[in-house]
Amino acid sequence: MATTSPSAMDHVSKKPKLADGEDAMDVDDKENRKIAKVAFDHETHMRIYYDSLFPAESMMKWLAYGNDLKHPQADAGFMQRREFCFTLPGDVFVRYQSFKDDKELRKELKSKLPSKIDIGPVFNVDPSKRLAYSGGAGSDRVFAPTEREFVMDIDMTDYDDVRTCCSAANICGKCWPLMTVAVKVIDAGLREDFGFEHLLWVYSGRRGIHCWVCDDRARKMSNESRAAVAEYFGVYKGADASGTVKRVNLTSPLHPSLQRAYADVLDPFWRRKILPDQELLTHEKTKDAILAMIPDAEARSRVESAWKGSDDSVARWEKLEQIVQRAIKADAKNYALRRCLHDIVFAHVYPRLDVEVSKHMNHLLKAPFCVHPKTGRVCVPMDPKTADDFDPMRVPTVNELLNELNAADGKVEATRMQKAVDCFNETFWNALEKECKGDLAAKTRENAATKGASATEW
């Protein structure tokens, strides 16, 4: 990575301090109102960021999947078929760009200074030449995607009916555990149920999380296969016509993957974090919605009576469980009642995906390491194994990184960006790079064996 002299950054404001007693994880809304602002000049600061901090080399190595190597089996034109989309200030979209290497990418970043970078699929031809391949149905000259990472998008706004602490773009330490649950459940499902190995988890910079599944077979999946994988996690089905009763797609007994999710993640988080922090059973709106999910009128009435004291949500949940379980013993064939405890937990805590993002190969998704234009936070990789410890409020902003770079005399390795790149490598790229190199070596051996067989036949 390039370095920047201290003099180039003398104008950057120092990192703001939080007020006494204020927790960095208290609240972060779309205007960052509770985190002191510093002056931000897009042109000046983003040019320094793209020149000195943005890990263009790591990004291009990943997206090339070994095809950037001078190897006889590498696809030399692979990267120039990958679409990049820049969003420029003023919401100007520049689509169908491609770059042969990290130097070319960095040059364009410094020139255009995008406020957002999106990554698209690998096409059959250079996307800049697409107009020559738009012959339509039946034509031999068709412009079409050939591969793309399978991606998942989880957004906190989809949980607004569960959150009592925040809404819309706001996030805090009380609702962020919903994202932690999503990472844990989806990561386990993709690895254990589908056998995927190379998953890159990225904080979106504001209120959500993205997952990039980068195994070769994931990148080659059809749109139909992508939809099937996404729907596998589609347990929550929204509210009923009344808008009150939440609907989930569960069986009794639970599917093994859902039983694993419930036992390992959902139930512990529900009791330890969600119930006490969101106070779901003391807030009038959420309390009534949960009561409405008890299908037996008599059991529902008993729960309501048991809640007339001043108990907290955890104590109220325990009473609800006891009453429902007694009702199940009295009517073992009431399958809706037998399922209702699971229904309540899954409806409130199970991951809620934006399925449309996952279904189509040509969907654009924000690139890792770009900067969220509303918060200034960098879209940093996450380690799913330590998802409990991830605090979005402590993710660095551009200004903070520039201050760190200035204080370290331009040494990138002394900034938190280096930690983000280390996380990218250690949790994701190192293993995938080894596999990519192994695949190229295997192709070389296969070709040598084929040539040897042909020579023998001749």
Task: Label each region the model flagged.
Residues 2-204, 216-223, 228-230, 235-347, ...:
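Signature for HUH/AEP ssDNA processing cores
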Residues 150, 209, 365:
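Residue-level detector of short, conserved catalytic/binding motifs and their immediate flanks
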Residues 184-188, 391-393, 399-401:
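HIT superfamily nucleotide-processing domains
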Residues 197, 207, 363:
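Residue-level signal for beta-strand positions within conserved beta-sheet cores that form or flank
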Residues 209-216:
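A short beta-strand motif that forms the metal-chelation/ATP-contact edge
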Residues 224-235, 383-398:
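Aromatic/acidic cage segments in peptide-binding pockets
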Residues 361-368, 372-391:
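Amphipathic alpha-helical/coiled-coil segments positioned at domain termini
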